[in-house]
Amino acid sequence: MKIKSINVMNYRNIDGNSMILHPESNYLIGENNLGKSNFLFLLDTVCNGKTFDEKDFTNPEAPIEITLELQLLPNEIGFFGDNFSPHDPTTIKLRYLQKIDESCPTCINYDTGESIQIRQLKKIHYIKYDTNALPSRELRVDTQRGTGLLVSSIIDKYIENIPEEKTFLNSEQIENLTNYLNEHLNKIRSFKEYSIMATVADTPNEMLSRLYYLSDGVRKIDCTGSGVQFIAMATINVLCQIMNIYKSKSIVFEDHLYTDDNGKKILPIILSVDEPEVHLHPFLQRSLIRYYKQILQNKDNDFIELLKMCFGIDGLNGQLIVVTHSTDALVGDYRNLIRFYKTEEKTNIISGISLNLRDENEKHLLMHFPEIKEAFYAKCVILIEGQTEYGCIPSFAETLNISLDDLGISVINAGGEGTIKPLKCLLDAFAIPSISIYDGDVKNGKTSATDEFFTNELCFEIEVVKHLYANGQTSIVKQIVQELDSKGENVVLEANYLKKPFEKMGINIATYTPKKLSDVSESDTAEFCNMYSAWYMKKKGILLGRIIGQILTPEQIPSCYADAIKKAQEVAQNV
């Protein structure tokens, strides 16, 4: 069972929004305070048949109305009795309504209007892991919640399988210790007057549960680092919440399961995680998300063994929903993203799975996703063609006294002119404004749009050299060479080495005589610009870009780059 889509009316700050969910994993992204966590609270309320609070109503005069569409497997048909779509028995649309003065909500079949018992919604099995939970409570073994509940159940299984008499401690010594302890406690007046005494646990389970504590082999778990505690809590939480379903008396556990075509008993669940990046470094963030995906798809044999031992089931069929502000937690591609953004003080939502992008662009986008993840959190994106520009633009912005981070401006290296357009289409589809900077060799007489900028020369490297030369700053051109390679001026540049740059500039390499940069006269405009441009082009990369960015003053920055950065600033400030 998976959530296919949801429509929200009159709920907090996500009123009037709809979204389509990916059947496997979803990442809710966007700026703070736009309703991502509110969406998880909404699912928790609806999927567990809870009542809305007064604060949940956007307009107290109108009801909250949630339309939830579920996709069922053929083996799950009947989970909600005869309630399913008349057009497709594997889907069911639910309407969940409540007025502010009503004590409980109403749930009906969207297509037929038939009433559905609220308790039936618990079969959706929505599990919400909250990273604000305290490890000191959740990882204690001596309680009947969290880890304690799970450990207690495992001990029960062990005790059930012991054929002989279940004696774990020396009864005589325990009795002597109890008498000794109470003899001293009885000297306290209140203990004596009210018969308060130390009492041995009635059952082996109760006694054994208090015998253990979690540790890393050296220290108690509560003395380990926060990251260790939170990763332990995050991974054990799923089992603990399934244990709550298993022990619940409201619905028989067997009624929560379906049997697949191979005869295996499967529990469908929807798992949500709010900000898994809390206390976890990037590798652990990715590891945790991949672990969740593995257990929800039955790809972790150890976890399957635990499910079999604890609950008598063979696996899970799960859907993952993650709220995150971390690019490291985005394990997937753009189709897994659900972006929250604001227009005119209202939250809007775009689902990546609902986008219709051209097939020829999709391969580019899927391959580039790891490099462009930051862009989905941005207010504006600057798209550039190559690594040299990528290395210099942050420094250019700083030189112009423009803070990219404060404004939420992301710089993305498209890796070539041919990829800028597909990336721009993707960003447009997610309502993310972008500014594109192209090399002049692709302009071909085209009139620039307001969000497009072109170098005057064939490429960035030539633009920098000629711009500096035109302003009488040949010493800066040479300084950049010296910063990148202290011997760069004194190496003979052979024809084969300069062949490609010369071809790009339309220079006949056959007329070239090998020489050093130091042999080039500053008074020879053509030779100086051609030789240094060719050297820059051969050395292009992030390091060259950073050196250029750090050396140039505001007046020395080529105008197309300064103008593009200022345009991005304007756009970001008005989003």
Task: Show which residues each predicted segment covers.
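Conserved P-loop NTP-binding catalytic core
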Residues: N38-H87
